[in-house]
Amino acid sequence: MARHSFIQMSKLPNVKGRISYITSHARQENLYATYRTADNAFWNNLARESRQEFQRSGAEGKCIEARELIIALPEVYTQYEPQQVLEDFTDEFRRRYGVECVSALHHNKRKTNYHICLLYTS
């Protein structure tokens, strides 16, 4: 039975923690590939500057440091090399929207299709 792809978006108040979680083989049982368009220093600076700007603004609630898309891919993508799928998708997203990204390619629990966790600057 063919399944449809879907996208879920979340706001991230702790981008460094989320990067650690989605890219960790110890925490992700079905992790096949990871990819970054910027190094750790970039993400550390982004988190620090976002928190500083949030404090200066006096806004209520949580500071949003980045955003995440969880994208379920059609089953046909399991036929392709995982690292290449992830890099092609992430590079196109970066080119199209002009944002830095961290991404990880996982299988769903039933191992029927891949999904990409894509963190990006907002």
Residue locations for each model-derived region?
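N-terminal nicking endonuclease/strand-transfer module with a His-rich metal-binding environment
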Residues: M1-S122
